[in-house]
Amino acid sequence: MVQRSKSSANWLREHFNDPFVKQAQKDGYRSRASYKLLEIQEKDRLIRPGMSVIDLGAAPGGWSQVTSRLIGGQGRLIASDILEMDSIADVTFIQGDFTHDEVLQRILEAVGDSHVDLVISDMAPNMSGTPAVDIPRAMFLCELALDLATRVLKPGGDFLIKIFQGEGFDVYLKDVRSKFDKVQMRKPSSSRDRSREQYLLGRGFKGA
């Protein structure tokens, strides 16, 4: 029999005792992450019917489920992740590593000549538990997401991204502030207390 590590056993115990995990199962959401977006939506009203949205780091689909329901049949949602994701009606899914140019090009092709209203990203690298390694990896993904957002957002569009406090955060925040009229931080109650994650919200894209 394989012996579970203490940290693995603790994670499993926390996961199955997590009220948001239980609520997600009850509500039919694919992950507890749905409640993070729902809480931000309740406060900021980011997502509206008929919007065009890109969802990065989408698998298993918790944010895409919420977004698809809110934008309705007249909206458009392009989702992407390195992992597979079970299909969601009317959602265009692009599987691949977002750090590869080929995947970026596929997303840009899906957007086409039009622009989008909102880019959301719940991307995170595989965490090693060593901040000196994990934070730079996470910031690299944030930089790539911001680069995409500046290419595809309409003037006045919005940007929501998961970010971790650490080296490079202040420079990144300054960069986002230069591109958006208003920038705020969000820490949903459904985000675990011990997690360093926060969500950075940029409203009112100034244009490329």
UniProtKB/Swiss-Prot annotation:
SUPFAM superfamilies named in the record: S-adenosyl-L-methionine-dependent methyltransferases
S-adenosyl-L-methionine recorded as keyword: yes
Record's catalysed reaction(s): uridine(2552) in 23S rRNA + S-adenosyl-L-methionine = 2'-O-methyluridine(2552) in 23S rRNA + S-adenosyl-L-homocysteine + H(+)
Protein's cellular compartments: Cytoplasm
Keywords: Cytoplasm, Methyltransferase, rRNA processing, S-adenosyl-L-methionine, Transferase
EC number assigned by the record: 2.1.1.166
Residues the entry annotates as binding S-adenosyl-L-methionine: G61, W63, D81, D97, D122
GO cellular component: cytoplasm
One Pfam assignment: FtsJ
GO MF annotation list: rRNA (uridine-2'-O-)-methyltransferase activity
Membrane-spanning segments: none
Primary enzyme class: transferase
Active site: K162 (proton acceptor)
Domain of life: Bacteria
Family per similarity comment: Belongs to the class I-like SAM-binding methyltransferase superfamily. RNA methyltransferase RlmE family.
Functional description taken from the UniProt entry: Specifically methylates the uridine in position 2552 of 23S rRNA at the 2'-O position of the ribose in the fully assembled 50S ribosomal subunit.
Name of this chain's protein: Ribosomal RNA large subunit methyltransferase E
